[in-house]
């Protein structure tokens, strides 16, 4: 469910879920983790760009076709483990990583983007963390935003559940650069080339030190987030939202 190609020393990983909004299904998660591992192990690759594809979303979050089925405790626990493992897979890449965000980055897609060293955003894209208004727990998102952007910003984003356009994302410092959609991938690759030119040893060891507490934070939130999501899914408050999104496919 991904395409992999190189632009000189930059590996471009393009998400290719059949749905243009790239919801994170189990298969897409595995494909992304495997692609990141290949890029990390390839000495010819000096930086990595992850992109949702032209006229597609970066990721609209969890795949509701799968998430709607979560009810048993063990299934919810396994799903949270998958989510945390995906995020840690990005943080463990020892090369520069760039997220090129177009369309929507919703929920899990928003959180996934925050794992990257740099984020570039199309001027028409939107970040959204809407979980709470739909009856879905947001403890993982809260932990991530609290770490990356501070407690007050985290509170605003997860409690207001609003769509954040490019100017608001810049205000919150969620992104490093905003460009036109047609220029997004080229701009991300250009930034990746800049960072790929840094001496490898200094970058690798600095990044490892920088990301270590972030990885530890995600590990710490596993059990607490399993409890939060069990309570939320077992209340079944989210089922109406899943039905509205999926329609006849529900």
Swiss-Prot record:
InterPro entries: ClpP/crotonase-like_dom_sf (IPR029045), Enoyl-CoA_hydra/iso (IPR001753)
Phenotype for residue 79 to A: Forms the C6 epimers of 6-methyl-t-CMP in 16:84 ratio of (6R):(6S) epimers
Protein's GO biological process: antibiotic biosynthetic process; fatty acid beta-oxidation
EC number of this enzyme: 2.3.1.226
Origin superkingdom: Bacteria
UniProt site (Important for catalytic activity): 131
Catalytic activity: (S)-1-pyrroline-5-carboxylate + malonyl-CoA + H2O + H(+) = (2S,5S)-5-carboxymethylproline + CO2 + CoA
Keywords: Antibiotic biosynthesis, Transferase
Residues that bind malonyl-CoA: 60-64
The keyword Flavoprotein is annotated on this UniProt entry: no
Pathway the protein contributes to: Antibiotic biosynthesis; carbapenem biosynthesis
GO MF annotation list: transferase activity
Something else known: Unusual member of the enoyl-CoA hydratase/isomerase family: in addition to decarboxylation and thioester hydrolysis steps, catalyzes C-C bond formation leading to a substituted heterocycle. Glu-131 is important in both C-C bond formation and thioester hydrolysis steps while it does not play an essential role in decarboxylation.
Family: Belongs to the enoyl-CoA hydratase/isomerase family.
Alphabetical list of PANTHER family matching this protein: ENOYL-COA HYDRATASE, MITOCHONDRIAL, ENOYL-COA HYDRATASE-RELATED
Oligomer status and interactors: Homotrimer.
Function of the molecule: Catalyzes the formation of (2S,5S)-carboxymethylproline (t-CMP) from malonyl-CoA and (S)-1-pyrroline-5-carboxylate, the first step in the biosynthesis of (5R)-carbapen-2-em-3-carboxylate, a beta-lactam antibiotic of the carbapenem class. Also catalyzes the independent decarboxylation of malonyl-CoA and methylmalonyl-CoA and the hydrolysis of CoA esters such as acetyl-CoA and propionyl-CoA. Catalyzes the reaction with a C2 epimeric mixture of methylmalonyl-CoA to give a 55:45 mixture of (6R)- and (6S)-epimers of 6-methyl-t-CMP, under standard incubation conditions.
Official protein name in the record: Carboxymethylproline synthase
């Amino acid at each position: 469910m991904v395409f992999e190609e190189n632009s000189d020393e930059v590996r471009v990983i393009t998400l290719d879920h059949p749905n243009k909004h790239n919801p994170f299904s189990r298969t897409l998660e595995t494909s992304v983790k495997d692609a990141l591992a290949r890029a990390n192990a390839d000495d010819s690759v000096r930086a990595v760009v992850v992109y949702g594809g032209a006229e597609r979303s970066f990721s609209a979050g969890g795949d509701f076709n799968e998430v709607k089925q979560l009810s048993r405790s063990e299934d919810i626990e396994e799903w949270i483990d998958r989510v945390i493992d995906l995020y840690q897979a990005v943080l463990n890449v020892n090369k520069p990583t760039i997220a090129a965000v177009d369309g929507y980055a919703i929920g899990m897609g928003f959180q996934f983007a925050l794992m990257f060293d740099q984020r570039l955003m199309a001027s028409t894209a939107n970040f959204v963390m809407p979980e709470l208004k739909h009856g879905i727990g947001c403890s993982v998102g809260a932990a991530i935003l609290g770490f990356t952007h501070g407690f007050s910003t985290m509170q605003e984003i997860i409690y207001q559940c609003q769509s954040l356009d490019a100017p608001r994302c810049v205000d919150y410092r969620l992104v490093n650069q905003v460009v036109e959609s047609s220029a997004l991938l080229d701009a991300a690759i250009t930034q990746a080339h800049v960072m790929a030119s840094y001496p490898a040893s200094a970058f690798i060891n600095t990044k490892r030190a920088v990301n270590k507490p972030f990885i530890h934070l995600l590990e710490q939130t596993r059990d607490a987030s399993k409890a939060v999501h069990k309570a939320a899914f077992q209340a079944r408050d989210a089922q109406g939202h899943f039905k509205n999104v999926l329609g006849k496919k529900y």
